[in-house]
Design a protein with these regions (language model features):
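Conserved Rossmann-fold NAD(P)-dependent oxidoreductase catalytic core, especially the SDR/UDP-sugar
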Residues: 6, 92-137, 163, 176
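Short-chain dehydrogenase/reductase
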Residues: 84, 88, 136-148, 178-186, ...
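NAD(P)H-binding glycine-rich loop region in Rossmannoid oxidoreductase-like domains
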Residues: 48-88, 100
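Active-site segment of SDR-like NAD(P)-dependent oxidoreductases
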Residues: 70-71, 112-120, 168-171
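Active-site Tyr-X1-5-Lys
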Residues: 135-168, 184-200, 204
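C-terminal substrate-binding subdomain of Rossmann-fold SDR/epimerase-dehydratase oxidoreductases
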Residues: 13-18, 22-30, 194-360
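SDR active-site strand-loop-helix element
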Residues: 13, 38, 63-69, 106-111, ...
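Adenosine-cofactor binding site in Rossmann-like domains, unifying the SAM/SAH pocket
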Residues: 28-53
Length: 360
């Protein structure tokens, strides 16, 4: 059972994360019933023995490998060893256990940061490994490339159907809003939310926020003066918000449930042999880009988030901090050939996510 069917026993690895939770929601919406999940407390994917036992006992037919150690520019810069070691460990354990236990179908979630820093835009799948990576997230990217190559190599040697997809920047329900370790859009939402509360001297809103999402040095009992002092560490002041870089970097963003729909469509319809020309001797770049096709500058993104959060203060840019890759837009030719197109533009998704954020 190499492709996903209604009868498949499906393991969603990382079902509490941004991507995994969206895949689980969409599988349930499509009527899939044999769904297997485990929390990190129930199954540590860095524990090879535990992973082997779990897959041997549960016998899934299909695995969505959405579990990963992820974060934004600051986290990637600071915790370089963690990003490469943990991601390689998760991938090694799940993929090899799946292979040993006869799991024929799997979908591996990579990241568009696998592409070279100066790759021609929009980035085609065959841009992989053609020039140097972006330094800030190089360890994470190398780990993801290794996972993709493991899937590709297992397919070629063992006849499995382990597909790899490379999503663009994602956002959605269940996102990580940590001010240090999150990606650009959720971090921006929280910073502008806090900046707006500080601008209005809304102590109740500030306290509610840290009660729901703890922030080092602050509690539900902290005073306005304490909030002002601590939030300054993140560029948040009573009159302005400072963001990293120049704001000129161009990025593509995709609603996580749109990604999930694309992943399930691929799992249902695609076999590995369709992803390279018949008779090809050197088979590579068999992954599939997944994106929205909607590209904005980080500066424009900040404006959209400010509108959604009703922020009326100043936004300033710290050009001494890195912008990351100058432009990242995926070529979606392979995806659109499957008949899939994303349906949630940023102007709709950002307010939806902010409403969800405020309700938590």
């Amino acid at each position: 059972m190499k492709q996903l069917t209604p009868e498949s026993r499906i393991y969603v690895a990382g079902h509490r994360g941004l991507v995994g939770s969206a895949i689980l929601r969409q599988l349930q919406a499509r009527g899939y019933q044999q769904l297997i999940t485990r929390t990190h407390q129930e199954l540590d994917l860095l524990d090879a023995v535990a992973v082997e036992r779990f897959i041997r006992e549960e016998r899934p037919d299909y695995i969505f490998l959405a579990a990963a150690h992820v974060g934004g520019i600051m986290a990637n810069q600071t915790y370089r060893a963690d990003f490469i070691m943990n991601n390689l460990g998760i991938q090694q354990n799940v993929l090899t256990s799946a292979l040993r236990n006869g799991v024929e179908g799997l979908l591996f979630l990579g990241s568009s940061c696998i592409y070279p820093r100066l790759a021609p835009q929009p980035m085609r799948e065959d841009a992989l490994l053609t020039s140097p990576l972006e330094y800030t997230n190089e360890p994470y990217a190398i780990a993801k490339i290794a996972g993709m190559k493991m899937c590709e190599s297992m397919n070629l040697q063992y006849g499995t159907n382990y597909l790899s997809v490379m999503p663009t920047n994602l956002y959605g329900y269940g996102d990580n809003f940590d001010l240090v370790n999150s990606h650009v859009l959720p971090a921006m939402i929280r910073k502008l939310h806090l900046a707006g509360a500080l601008l209005r001297s809304d102590l109740a809103a500030l306290r509610r926020d840290v009660a729901q999402r703890p922030l080092e040095g602050l509690t539900e009992q902290s005073s306005l003066e304490e909030f002002t002092a601590e939030l300054a560490r993140y560029g948040i002041t009573p009159t302005s918000l400072q963001l990293w870089g120049t704001g000129s970097a161009l990025r593509e963003f995709m609603w996580s449930d749109d990604l999930a729909e694309a992943c399930i469509t691929i799992a249902e319809r695609v076999s590995f042999a369709e992803l390279y020309p018949a008779g090809e001797r050197e088979i590579r770049n068999t992954h599939i880009n997944i994106g929205s096709g909607e590209e904005v500058s980080i500066r424009t993104l900040a404006t959209l988030v400010a509108e959604a959060t009703h922020y009326e203060g100043r936004i300033e840019w710290d050009s001494t901090k890195p912008d990351g890759t100058p432009r990242k837009l995926l070529d979606l030719t392979r995806l659109t050939s499957l008949g899939y197109t994303a349906t949630t533009p940023l102007a709709v998704g950002i307010p939806q996510l902010y409403d969800w954020y405020c309700q938590q």
